[in-house]
Amino acid sequence: MLGRDGVMPLDHFRRLIDVHLIGTFNMIRLFADKARHLDPLSEDGDRGVIVNTSSIFGLEGQIDAVSYSAAKAGIAGMTLPLARELAREGIRVVAIAPGIFETPMVTSLRETAREQILDAVAFPKRMGKPREYAQLVRHICENNMLNGAVIRIDAGIRT
């Protein structure tokens, strides 16, 4: 928030909140409006599941990332209330809070920065792979008992 070049512009904070939090909410509301009119997919009466991406930064915060952390915390924070509200429509809501994954953003960091991040990882001592994230999404979609939860997938990292 306070850097070498001065205070963070408020527009920077607003932009990250708008993209990550408000953008997520917008997609949820549009999907929910369409999904509630679908025929149930099973005897449970489910009409779909919304899987959002939060972040461990949203659960624990991260230095130099207050706006990103706040946006991702908002996604985690609205998961249970949305699950409760959309339950009557047969729509589940779950959020995933990933740790450090092999993404272009992370792999573009300097090697020393990546090593520093990996020092905080418990086990396995590596970045997550996109397929591991996808496996969790699939499990969420297949298991109707998962609803209203924020699931960490972070190899025990604590920042």
Residue ranges with predicted function:
Residues 33, 84-85:
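Alpha-helical segment proximal to the catalytic Tyr-Lys
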Residues 6-26, 51, 75:
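Catalytic Tyr-X3-Lys loop
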Residues 17-18, 112-132:
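Catalytic Tyr-x(3-8)-Lys segment
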